[in-house]
Amino acid sequence: MSTEGFDYEAAIVVVGGGACGLMAAYQAGRRGLDVVLLEKDSRLGCNAEIASGSIPAAPTAHQRRAGVTDSAEQMMGDILRKSGNQADPDIVRALCERSPELIRIFEDELGVAMELNTDAGRYGFSALRLHNGPGRTGAPLIQALRSALAGMGNVTCADRTPGAGLITDGSGAVMGVRAGMRGEQRLGAQRVILACDGFGSNAEMIARYIPEMRGVQSIGVQGNTGDAIRWGMELGAAVAHMSGYQGHGLVCAGYGTRLVPEIPQLGAIIVNRQGERFAREDQGYSEFAREVLAQDGQTAVAIFDQRMVDVVARLDHWKDTVASGAVKSAQSLQELAAAFKLPPEALERSFAQCCGDLPDPFGRARLPAPAEAPFHGAVITGAMVHTQGGLVVDVHARVLRPDGSAIPNLYAGGGSAAGLSGDRPEGYLSGNGLLSAYGLGLIAGEHAAASLLARSH
């Protein structure tokens, strides 16, 4: 395709205005380069904005103050172990080693008050290392990056201007991006960073790569159509882990909200409509989605008590869930069982497995079972949050071909790049998505900028 006749030219064009794209644009912009950020539609939000905003990082000052001993190596081990050793160890190491820097950037450069989540651990974690902004949602992090970019005169943020394809020269090197609803604009670029999300809203790609989730609700934002992955594949890029995804087994059926992951970790009991437990409740919420979807009606009932609610009551996601009406309350377990039409005898047996004399067939850790009135419950189902497969990149976030060579001038991160979770939902460890998004955004923006600045000297 001809490289002449560009409507606009920039040093770097970033496609996608979520966590990865914003961080990439920030890293390149603060180095003084001319950056254009294309965003499909910020009104749709991004997955990082509606998520809990949990960034795993180690070691950090927050951990030290809390008496938590941790390291990048320990964090790397947890991620690789959870992925079944399918994640690329070089990528995992690069992200883990840069993780404390992410927390520092948000605190020291962007003014976000970060905290270490000490309310409850996460399945697969050997130490407390999830760091959050205010209210424990992702919105303050995204807003801080947007505000920072708005103050940079060398960064142009083009909202409601989706990327529509890549422009290459005769050798296959990327030279720019087509943009606009019909691809009517041609933007020249010395470097292009693909920072779109995955393909959770693309029914055709779901049917092809993740058939078990065909027709299952996706709670990610609806603009995730896999565009960047397809563009890369058209240029001969390698892809990996296309069957991988992050599930969520704690979605409040019919309410558009979800229980926070702390609830099962604090000891909630989850039963099917027959009042029977069907899996260990404290497993990862990603793989738990499959367990819930296998039950009658693809639903289950989570039961928890006031002690657990008191721990999470201040969280914005929890407030939204309560406001939605998804949580029912009662002064006794018998009343709560009646409210959800659960057989009381079966429910008693389920409780006995967790805190009584019966052995637990699922091997759950002995957690305090719901015991303090008032008792609470919610009907939950399984859903998909976002896909984990994508373009293969190196430790500098450059997009690679199957032979390991880099496609010239092309970078990828976030949902556009292969994630850290391997081929299955059980490979997902809490925070993998944001670590990959913000981390690869940092790395891509930094490397793309450095490569151009080095060439100019």
Language-model regions: role of each:
Residues 183, 187-251, 434-443:
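Glycine-rich loop(s) and the adjacent beta-strand/alpha-helix scaffold that form part
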Residues 165, 346-424:
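A glycine-rich dinucleotide-binding beta-alpha-beta segment and adjacent secondary-structure elements
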